[in-house]
């Protein structure tokens, strides 16, 4: 490595907001199953506090050694609906509290996996877990919840979509932060290190380390050096920058897995913004030549960015996974907030962008008077985009305040302007229930 590369790395960290967004330990809870919910809760607490006892300390040590900030240390677990189904309990709040107590005691930032996978219908534990979500998120500090309502192979469970529209409303009423910790997915992945949608898939090893990186500022600075150049040069520049970012993510993941004595899972190639100036995905798109995100050309710019990040990342690391794309959360990206306030970015344009990028309608505040059927219809639209395009999509939406208000979440969750919603009803559409069948191109065998 020559002196120029050393200088570039120092600049990435000190000036361009590069960091490791998260190291997330995935832990299987399948061996914690018990017919008694209190015994199951005790087993869950014991396993998490044993396996992840040193996660925070190891993360801090690696950050100090490498001089690279590791912003979050997190845990993801087996979807709790699977564990709860073995009990006769009618509420899974005790399991949520066990997760929360374990997370608090080991010092991690969040714990994900209060989750259910219902893309093709409800099993015993699924409905109970979903109905438990509002109070589970209201009565815990660090628990995150997710529900997968669709997949390319299964179609969309519209009964679950309707239920989740109602649950999001109830969750937002039950607590200030609850809805920000709840994600509704289509094509959810089993190795996602990012919250609030992380859970540990049943096909995963017993315990693994997954890493999520963050580098929008690094990409923007690289693009500043090629202003006026062709799209070919633009794509190559993003690709090379993503390579550097991912290499560091892989190094951190390998060091953490070795020191913790668990397997190394994946590096998630996502570009994750923060509310800080200089750490915005929106500003990367604007650096490509857009006056403001949301104008015509935004989707094309996002497509170039997303693809080039994947190509560079795959070259840098042979174990990539998770969501792996550009995140466009409104409240967590100062450029997105500015675009909404400037009238350039609306829900419909964000929805179009989700056909390309990672995840979907993320950290968006809408008026609290929005009917649950309208929220369900938003979920259905996002799920349809994911199911048809064979990609992960999601909705993390917060019904609070009235149009034009600013809702402050604090920390990495930022501040969201309350965005207008189409006033026309989707009630009769959502009331149908049942299943939207899988698309014809899902039949691969």
Swiss-Prot record:
Signal peptide: none annotated. SUPFAM superfamilies: PFL-like glycyl radical enzymes. Pfam families: DUF711 (PF05167). It comes from the Bacteria. Homodimer. Belongs to the UPF0210 family. This is UPF0210 protein SZO_15840. It comes from Streptococcus equi subsp. zooepidemicus (strain H70). The lineage of its organism: Bacteria, Bacillati, Bacillota, Bacilli, Lactobacillales.
